Design a protein with these regions (language model features):
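Short, Lys/Arg- and Gly-enriched loop/turn segments at beta-strand edges
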Residues: 219-232
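Short peripheral tails and domain-boundary helices/loops at the edges of structured domains
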Residues: 229-248
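Structural detector for short beta-strands of small beta-barrel domains
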Residues: 151-174
Length: 248
């Protein structure tokens, strides 16, 4: 029987791939093994031997390591750590501002002009945590050479939608889009949107039903959300939009 740490690592690897697959498939992050990662994760064959492939996601890995270190977790791909990064959970609260500040300065500081560098580095003392949305709205949009528009940030953030129809490889969800309201980030009125739930017959939302809530990343249904995960995602999303709006 695998050790408990191996089980936590394996489930964390699956969870990471659920969210990382589609941007990896689209060529935005990670290496070139997206089909292998999807197959292994969707068929329950993910194990710690896949970790070297996951470390190629160089945007996410520093945040995972920060969360793990702050919580005394050896493996940055532990399920609890991965969940904290993508969806938010209690592990985020234990990350000290000074530690996130140091990580951001070391990893991204040299890639930002002085004014933007100062703007990003002021966010940890204001309450920012190593949460995916923080990277999207307060780091990623400043790192790209070309302007990152609302459409890219909207696709890149982890959102949630309630399933209204299931149709083969796709589901239709009611989902709130990211919008600008009086020059500030906000969530708009829910709108129907069709998202993929499987690719070449493989996916992570096979048992979804009308009325379920799913997380969405780059038009991909990552998983069915229980009440706890949905509440955490909503909470940490609102928190980081508030922080982003201070300097938008």
């Amino acid at each position: 029987m695998p050790a408990q740490t191996d089980l936590a690592s394996s489930s964390g690897i699956v969870l990471f791939i659920r969210y990382a697959f589609m941007p990896n498939h689209l060529g935005y992050c990670g290496g070139n093994e997206n089909e292998l990662l999807l197959e292994r994760a969707a068929t329950g064959q993910a194990d710690p031997r896949l970790t070297p492939l996951l470390t190629q996601f160089t945007g996410a890995t520093p945040y995972l390591r920060s969360i793990a270190a702050a919580n005394g977790v050896r493996d940055p791909f532990d399920r609890r750590v991965v969940e904290a990064y993508w969806l938010g959970n209690e592990l985020l609260a234990r990350v000290e501002a000074r530690d996130l500040y140091q990580m951001l300065e070391e990893r991204f500081g040299a890639h930002l002009p002085p004014k933007l560098r100062e703007q990003v580095l002021r966010k940890p003392p204001e309450g920012a945590k190593p949460f995916h949305l923080f990277h999207v709205v307060d780091v990623y949009r400043h790192l790209e050479r070309e302007t990152v528009g609302m459409a890219a940030m909207e696709s890149c953030r982890i959102s949630w939608g309630q399933v209204r129809a299931v149709d083969g490889a796709s589901v239709t969800v009611d989902r709130q889009p990211l919008v600008l309201r009086e020059g500030k980030f906000a969530l708009g009125e829910a709108q129907p949107e069709r998202v993929l739930r499987s690719f070449d017959g493989l996916g992570f939302a096979e048992d979804v039903s009308v009325g379920d809530w799913v997380s969405v990343h780059w038009g991909w249904a990552c998983e069915v959300l229980d009440d706890r995960k949905l509440a955490n995602l909503r909470r940490w999303t609102a928190h980081h939009l508030t922080i982003a709006n201070r300097t938008i």
